[in-house]
C-alpha cells in the first residue's frame, strides 16, 4: 500500500515574475486585537478581475515571448516550428494593442482563488469576481462563448460570458495573501492580488 502524500492543487513554486500593481484602492490593513488582517473591498476584486481578463486575452508573459523567440533562433528548430513561433509572435504583437484578443474564442472564465485566513472581504467574493468578468466581456472586444439552456433542445448565448467557474479555497500556508489564478481557454496568468 502506498504511503499517504498530500499536495496542494497547483502549488506555487519560486516566482520571479514581474507583476504590475493594479491598484491599492479598496485594500487596507485592519487590526483586531493583536492580529492584523488584510481587508479587500468588493470593488477591488471587481477591478482586479476585469484587469486579469483583459491581460490574459491580450498579453503573453515575457518568459513566454522569450521562449517563442528562442524557437525562431534555434538552429535545430524545423521550418514548421519557426513558422508557428513567428505567427504566435505576430499574433501577440497585434493582441498587445489591447483591441483584438490573442484567440477569437476567449473561452469560459475559470477563476481559482486561495484566500489566507487573515484576509477579510465583505459580501460574496464570487459576486464581485463575476461582476469583473461581466464588465470585461461587455466592455472589451471579447467574444461571448457561454451558452445557456433555454429548453431541453434550445440554447442561447448569455451575452456576457457568465456564468464563470469560480472556486475559492482557504489557504493557511499564506495567511495574509489572496492569490488568484484566472484561466481563459488557452491563456493563463497567476497574479498575487495583495499581501501584507
Locate the predicted segments by residue.
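A generic, well-ordered mixed alpha/beta core segment in the N-terminal half of proteins
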Residues: 107-174
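Short coil/turn segments at secondary-structure boundaries
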Residues: 64-68, 101-104, 145-149
